[in-house]
Amino acid sequence: MKVLLDIIEDIENFIRQLEKRRGELEELKDEILIFSDAEFIDSIQRGLSDLEQGRSKVCSNLEEVKKLFEDI
């Protein structure tokens, strides 16, 4: 009887791990799709370049965002 309970517990653990892995694989698939998009990568690179050259502003809180929009 103990052996059967151990087998059932092992199967339950395996199923829980499969569910977790499925979620992780979905996230990985989404990331691969995003980063395989050449336009998206170009956009990210342009944004980083703009940031480095001071052509964009980074706001660290809501007050800075409000002030930025007031200044526009």
From Swiss-Prot:
Protein's UniProt name: Uncharacterized protein AF_1094
Organism expressing this protein natively: Archaeoglobus fulgidus (strain ATCC 49558 / DSM 4304 / JCM 9628 / NBRC 100126 / VC-16)
Lineage: Archaea, Methanobacteriati, Methanobacteriota, Archaeoglobi, Archaeoglobales
